[in-house]
Amino acid sequence: MFSDDKEANKGTIKLAYAQQDDQIVSTNVIAQVLEEQGYKVDTTSLDIPVTWEAVSKGEVDAMTGAWLPITHGAEYKKVKNDIDNLGPHIDKEAKLGLVVPKYMDVNSIEDLNNQANKKITGIEPGAEIVDATNETLKAYPNLKGWEQINSSTGAMNAELKRAIKNKDDIIITGWNRYWIFQRYDLKYLDDPKGSMGKAESINTIARKGLKEDEPEAYRILDNFKWSVKDMESIMLEIENGKDPEKATKEWIDNNRDKVDKWTEK
């Protein structure tokens, strides 16, 4: 995925990721940092269950897309004795929820009554957040008669843009590590019943033996810590048309104090 002018003089690190924005961005960042330290980095896109299997079998060295303890809890349970869980690089900031523009005079799901024609604008059917929203419609008595409208993430983004331009009411399904939070003034609605789920962490997972085989790379992966805001800032640059590799490099260059903590010995 990446190129580096200088000749790598260390080993090759193999990273796996799924085709999700948060995994792509975090993999890009840690790959470029490893390359700066002299490693050659190979990245492979796999389905989520296969990423776990590949790390557990030692077919790849690491991944940065482990949502724990809930979303990937079943995958983790299957292989937890065959991997090293290096802990969160995003600590308890990954969440799903119902999101509205800040100009709307509602702060909780319980405040909803007839806003936006009793419609929640969602994404593709089958996504986890779609199921959570359907559970929320059942959990809150004030949402009786409401419905979730599903099409695509792009269509939801277009509806959000239109609504904000006109200062119309809109309720969308939202999640942290998404560029819309950097572009618009949005807020999560409180979820006292917890039907949208709790905030999770995104962890780095390494294969057994990587610590002994490549101790410096292992240490960098172990030290990798940043925030949802960091991640979303890169996503926004890419959404605005910047080349992903360039957007990643610029973030690294502008956050040397943070990156230096990952690479310090």
Where are these predicted regions, by residue range?
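An extracytoplasmic/periplasmic, membrane-proximal ligand-sensing/linker region
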Residues: G11-I13, D21-I24, T136-K144, T153-K167, ...
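Short helix-initiation/N-cap motifs at beta->coil->alpha
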Residues: A18-D21, D42-A54, Q148-E159
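Ligand-binding cleft/hinge of the Venus flytrap
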Residues: V29-Q37, A116, G122-Q148, D253
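Ligand-binding pocket segment of bilobal, Venus flytrap-like solute-binding proteins
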Residues: V60-T64, A132-G194
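A bilobed periplasmic-binding-protein/Venus flytrap-type ligand-binding module shared by bacterial periplasmic
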Residues: K95-D105, E200-E214
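Pocket-flanking alpha-helical
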Residues: T27, D47-N81, A158-E159, W179-Y184
